Amino acid sequence: MALVVQKYGGSSLESAERIRNVAERIVATKKAGNDVVVVCSAMGDTTDELLDLAAAVNPVPPAREMDMLLTAGERISNALVAMAIESLGAEAQSFTGSQAGVLTTERHGNARIVDVTPGRVREALDEGKICIVAGFQGVNKETRDVTTLGRGGSDTTAVALAAALGADVCEIYSDVDGVYTADPRIVPNAQKLERLSFEEMLELAAVGSKILVLRSVEYARAFNVPMRVRSSYSNDPGTLIAGSMEDIPMEEAVLTGVATDKSEAKVTVLGIPDKPGEAAKVFRALADAEINIDMVLQNVSSVEDGTTDITFTCPRSDGPRAMELLKKMQQQGDWTNVLYDDQVGKVSLVGAGMKSHPGVTAEFMEALRDVNVNVELISTSEIRISVLIREDDLDKSAKALHEKFQLGGDEEATVYAGTGR
């Protein structure tokens, strides 16, 4: 008997009809001889609606109370899924994140999982019940306050539970039936991938693929939890994410796909003294403010005045905070000016095959040249090339790269209604 953890996204649970459909799939998995644990996201746009409601009563709501509010969304879908399963004649028991033993750090709004002690879930499984766990939430061990895990936290909840329970697989259900060589909404002939290594999926998640959140893939890799991305609208087996890139024979390594990201902003700090410790001053201030940095470029030092410029990208949502912080430091005479640009985007090519295919970077740049796209920043890893370009050029760049590296197929991809969550 296998233990299967299934996670259902908000689009899969947005109505009573879809909840009943999900319940039928869950019960079928149980009847096939499996133990089943289900992690639920909030229904449809519930989380966004709760955020709007909070803003209407308090423009700056307390973080603790915001977590108390937002976790209600998952508890609602949790209970409804359990009810639907019971209506089909199977036994189900729902749990909040706290009841399921999801222990987190104290940071409200973006807590990290530190441990999972799913004793009550294990007991219910032993009694033959289907266990339904509210995603996106946990509890701080010291304060006992409810916490939330940030956007995409239900994916992380599912993988963490799968690891703690020793599950055979963690299935992530949404409105897409797998991981594609590109977003089918941008590149119609994108092809579904049957299998990816953890490293390839980590790179795709890090550079903009919305199918899985980065933290969930990091967790799966750390605890070697196989993941399968599937659609709740079909019976297609989807994409399996498992194993290491090192296990892929060199001759079989391929270029995996193209991803785009519209969530970053570019910041340039001008006139920084070109001497030891000055760049560290910039990035220490940003780190202390918990602002993540992605791409970085430092210009050649100016001979005339001994200064340099540093350009970096950060989440667009953190851009105003970064600018406020750096402008304050500018007033202290640390540098001459700070520039901000939020009309940028990142396009990336990922694949284990880069290690064995000379000339990938040249072909990448030629593809962008052919569609008249200018590159502003470049970042690479062993299996990834990313460039920063104008946001308006993202779609045509993705299409050009996808065609250049022959990643497409003869048929158009099937796109179900929804957003990929």
Swiss-Prot record:
Residues recorded as binding ATP, renumbered to this chain, are K7, Y8, G9, G10, S41, S174, D175, Y180, T181, A182, D183, P184, R185, K210
Q: What reaction does this enzyme carry out catalytically?
A: L-aspartate + ATP = 4-phospho-L-aspartate + ADP
Q: Which InterPro entries match?
A: AceGlu_kinase-like_sf, ACT-like_dom_sf, ACT_Aspartokinase, ACT_dom, AKii-LysC-BS, Asp/Glu/Uridylate_kinase, Asp_kin_monofn, Asp_kinase
Q: Which pathway does UniProt place it in?
A: Amino-acid biosynthesis; L-lysine biosynthesis via DAP pathway; (S)-tetrahydrodipicolinate from L-aspartate: step 1/4; Amino-acid biosynthesis; L-methionine biosynthesis via de novo pathway; L-homoserine from L-aspartate: step 1/3; Amino-acid biosynthesis; L-threonine biosynthesis; L-threonine from L-aspartate: step 1/5
Task: From the record, give the cysteines joined by S-S bonds.
Answer: none
Q: What is its EC number?
A: 2.7.2.4
Positions annotated to bind substrate: 25-30, 45-49, 74, 125-126, 151-154, 274-279, 292-294, 298, 360-361, 374-375, 381-382
Instruction: State whether keyword Transferase applies.
Output: yes
Picking any one GO biological process from the record gives: homoserine biosynthetic process
Superkingdom per UniProt: Bacteria
Q: Which Gene3D superfamilies match?
A: 3.30.70.260, Acetylglutamate kinase-like
Q: What class of enzyme is it?
A: transferase
- Print the keywords alphabetically: Amino-acid biosynthesis, ATP-binding, Diaminopimelate biosynthesis, Kinase, Lysine biosynthesis, Nucleotide-binding, Repeat, Transferase
**Which molecular-function annotation in GO is an example for this chain?**
aspartate kinase activity
Q: Give the positions of the site Contribution to the catalysis.
A: K7, E74
PANTHER family, A to Z: ASPARTATE KINASE, ASPARTOKINASE
Role summary: Catalyzes the phosphorylation of the beta-carboxyl group of aspartic acid with ATP to yield 4-phospho-L-aspartate, which is involved in the branched biosynthetic pathway leading to the biosynthesis of amino acids lysine, threonine, isoleucine and methionine.
Oligomeric state and interaction partners are given as: Tetramer consisting of 2 isoforms Alpha (catalytic and regulation) and of a homodimer of 2 isoforms Beta (regulation).
The entry assigns this protein to a family as follows:
Belongs to the aspartokinase family.
Name-wise, this protein is Aspartokinase
